[in-house]
Amino acid sequence: TTRAPREGEVDGVSYLFVSDDRFDEMVAQDRLLEWAQVHDHRYGTPRDLVERHIAAGDQVFLEIDVQGALQVRSKFPAAHLVFIAPPSMEELERRLRGRGTDSEESIRLRLANAEGELRLKEEYDECFVNDDVDACLASLIAYVERFSEKKEEDRL
């Protein structure tokens, strides 16, 4: 990402934090599987990292926005896309304000972007509403386990 690290984030763990110039180089060299402009910054997924894990037979999980997810789907049609939705726009706004890390302008931008992203949730294979984090996580884990079991059956 081209954004600055937030408190507690570690380069190479939370994200790879790069300059705008470095990000431009990565795009020009086709080193990103997907990338997108999100909330005034650019985010992307290094292609080599994903391809290494796929080649090793690993399951790959990407936490990316709608733009990036649709790019991944175009390159990997068998990818499973899961959309995590807020229970309501009001709750999303409450959560954003509760973080205490975003300016008023940033919150407005994030809410506007979220409305657009919610209109595209039908492009995903599954949608979970994050009204309770533990329940949402349990549903997501169950979904991944079902998918993993099917992959094992396909290998036999």
Predicted regions and their residues:
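A short acidic, helix-capping loop that chelates divalent metal ions and anchors anionic groups
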Residues: A4-V10, E91-R94, G100
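Conserved catalytic network of the ASCE P-loop NTPase/AAA+ motor domain
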Residues: G8, R52-A55, R73-P77, R119-K121
